[in-house]
């Protein structure tokens, strides 16, 4: 007998609420402002069935293209075969949240602007590119009271 593959099949854990987060939804969810062009994460809320996305879109990130009274339209790029297809999904605000994916970039832009302002006031140049972590500096370890130990592998034995 074949198994049924309904709209919400296989979502027993994906759509469940977080630990100690059951019950009424906080009002802050409804008071968030979404604007066209915002980057949002889709996270389906299992306690609200209206405007819930298909399980494929759970955990995906998209861009808001439409805002209505109680829902937002989100554009997501879906991989189909060997290409991307732009999908437009309409979701209620309970199932989306602002993405933090650009937060580091926006913070860096602000800090770079502050560094530029400060450098211009002091009349000096500033290097704003990020640098990879450099190797640690050399150290000298004393062997006084710290005798070096020779390490050797333990012979492999089979215990049956």
Swiss-Prot record:
The gene is RPL21A. This is Large ribosomal subunit protein eL21. Its main location: cytoplasm. Belongs to the eukaryotic ribosomal protein eL21 family. It is found in: Cytoplasm. InterPro entries: Ribosomal_eL21 (IPR001147), Ribosomal_eL21_CS (IPR018259), Ribosomal_eL21_sf (IPR036948), Translation_prot_SH3-like_sf (IPR008991). One of its GO terms (biological process) is translation. Keywords: Cytoplasm, Ribonucleoprotein, Ribosomal protein. Component of the large ribosomal subunit. Mature ribosomes consist of a small (40S) and a large (60S) subunit. The 40S subunit contains about 32 different proteins and 1 molecule of RNA (18S). The 60S subunit contains 45 different proteins and 3 molecules of RNA (25S, 5.8S and 5S). GO terms for molecular function: structural constituent of ribosome. Component of the ribosome, a large ribonucleoprotein complex responsible for the synthesis of proteins in the cell. The small ribosomal subunit (SSU) binds messenger RNAs (mRNAs) and translates the encoded message by selecting cognate aminoacyl-transfer RNA (tRNA) molecules. The large subunit (LSU) contains the ribosomal catalytic site termed the peptidyl transferase center (PTC), which catalyzes the formation of peptide bonds, thereby polymerizing the amino acids delivered by tRNAs into a polypeptide chain. One of its GO terms (cellular component) is cytosolic large ribosomal subunit. PANTHER family: 60S RIBOSOMAL PROTEIN L21.
């Amino acid at each position: 007998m074949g198994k049924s593959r309904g709209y919400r099949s296989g979502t027993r854990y994906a759509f469940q609420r977080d630990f100690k987060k059951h019950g009424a939804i906080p009002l802050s969810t409804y008071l968030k402002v979404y604007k066209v062009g915002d980057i949002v994460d889709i996270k389906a809320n299992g306690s609200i069935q209206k405007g819930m996305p298909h399980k494929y879109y759970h955990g995906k990130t998209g861009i808001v293209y439409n805002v209505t009274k109680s829902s937002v339209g989100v554009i997501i790029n879906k991989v189909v075969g060997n290409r991307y297809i732009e999908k437009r999904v309409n979701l209620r605000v309970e199932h989306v949240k602002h993405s933090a994916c650009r937060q580091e970039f926006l913070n860096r832009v602000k800090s770079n602007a502050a560094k530029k302002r400060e450098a211009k006031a002091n009349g000096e140049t500033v290097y704003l590119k990020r640098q990879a972590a450099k190797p640690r500096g050399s150290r000298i370890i004393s062997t006084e009271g710290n005798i070096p130990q020779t390490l050797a592998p333990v012979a492999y034995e089979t215990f049956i």
